[in-house]
Regions:
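N-terminal beta-loop-helix "entrance" segment that forms/cooperates
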Residues: 38-54, 149-152
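N-terminal beta1-alpha1 ligand-phosphate binding loop
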Residues: 1-30
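A generic structural motif
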Residues: 27-34, 134
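Glycine-rich phosphate/pyrophosphate-binding loop and the adjoining helix
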Residues: 4, 135-193
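Helix-loop-strand module that forms the ligand-binding subsite of alpha/beta enzymes
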Residues: 52-132
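A general structural signal for well-ordered alpha-helical segments in protein cores
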Residues: 3, 16, 20, 57, ...
Length: 193
C-alpha cells in the first residue's frame, strides 16, 4: 500500500517533515510512505491551469492520484493553514471532476513549536479536504513543542503510540475503501439522497 506524505512546511529542517518520516517507520506491515515536495508548485492561477498542466503541478497531481492513502502534516502560521499547503491542495483539486483527493483516505497531523501543536491548522485543513471530497479521519494529533518532540526523531512515547494507532486506522480504512470502492462520506450522502 502506497501512503503519500505531504508536509505543509518548506523548511529544510521541518518538524512536520520529521513527523512524516517517523510516521513512515510506524506504518503497519505492507504499507510504505513516500514524501512529495510542494515547494516547486507555482501559486495557483486559473489562467495557468492549462492542459497540459505545468510540470510541477502534473507531478504533484500524479503523486496524489497514485497514492492509496495520504498523511498531511501541517505547521500552523497565524492560527491557520500555511500558504504552500493550501496552494498544493488548490492545484490538485482542480478541475473538480478530476480531483485525485476525492474519496482518498487522509490522516491530518501537525507539529508546531507552540504548546497547541497546530490544532487550528489541522481543523482548517480537515475542513478543506472534506470539502473537496477526501475521506478524512476525524482525529487530530497535535505535536506541541516540536523542536523538542520531533527535531531528532520522534522521542515522545505517547505521541508515537497515538501516531501508530492513527496510522493503523488509516491503513484499515484504506483497505476497507478499496474493498467497497473509494467514496467519501459526502459521495455516500449524495448517493443515498
Amino acid at each position: 500500500m502506497k501512503v503519500l506524505g505531504i508536509s505543509g512546511s518548506l523548511r529544510k529542517d521541518s518538524h512536520n517533515t520529521s513527523l512524516l518520516r517517523a510516521a513512515g517507520e510506524l506504518l503497519p506491515p505492507g504499507a510504505e510512505l513516500d514524501l512529495v515536495g510542494i515547494g516547486d508548485l507555482p501559486l495557483y492561477d486559473e489562467d495557468a491551469d492549462t492542459d497540459p498542466a505545468p510540470d510541477a503541478v502534473a507531478r504533484f497531481r500524479d503523486a496524489v492520484a497514485s497514492a492509496d492513502a495520504i498523511v498531511v502534516s501541517t505547521p500552523e502560521y497565524n492560527a491557520s493553514i500555511p500558504g504552500p499547503l493550501k496552494n498544493a491542495i488548490d492545484w490538485a483539486s482542480r478541475p473538480f471532476e478530476a480531483n485525485p483527493f476525492r474519496g482518498k483516505p487522509v490522516l491530518v497531523v501537525g507539529a508546531s513549536t507552540g504548546l497547541f501543536g497546530a490544532v487550528w491548522a489541522q481543523a482548517e485543513i480537515r475542513k478543506v479536504l472534506d470539502h473537496i471530497g477526501a475521506n478524512v479521519l476525524d482525529t487530530e494529533l497535535p505535536v506541541g513543542q516540536a523542536h523538542e518532540a520531533v527535531a531528532h526523531g520522534l522521542r515522545d512515547a505517547g505521541i508515537s503510540a497515538e501516531l501508530e494507532r492513527q496510522l493503523a486506522v488509516l491503513v484499515a480504512m484504506t483497505r476497507d475503501a478499496e474493498a467497497v470502492g473509494h467514496r467519501s462520506h459526502r459521495e455516500r450522502e449524495r448517493v443515498a439522497a
